[in-house]
Amino acid sequence: MEAGLEHLSRGTGKHVARLVAVLEPYYRSMETARNVAALANELGIADVVVVANKVRDNADRSAIAEFCRAHEMRLVGEVPYDGQLADVERRGAAPIDAAPGSPAVVAIEALAGPLASDAPMQVRE
């Protein structure tokens, strides 16, 4: 689904087992993820997890981890910032096909299985 709250407010979350909120290390993005997580909880989605995207350095990592702790959000993974993906996106190609060994694609592949599984996910500190 596309980013935003409108999908949840339309009732599309009725049969959702796990909601993944993706946030970037920017205040507005983190606040949006917090709002998504809160709405998901209100709608009865019990398993809400957070994945950090476009993480550049330890400052980004720390800011995201601190925000998630402060708002009781379960941070379960991160995808590093990867300049290759901007080039791939401009070409309209799929990152997994056009840049299969890139750091971001490798991180996404590592997260895909656990995110799709019914098993509980380990929270990152």
For each of these PLM feature ranges, what is it?
Residues 91-106:
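C-terminal boundary of histidine-terminating zinc-finger modules
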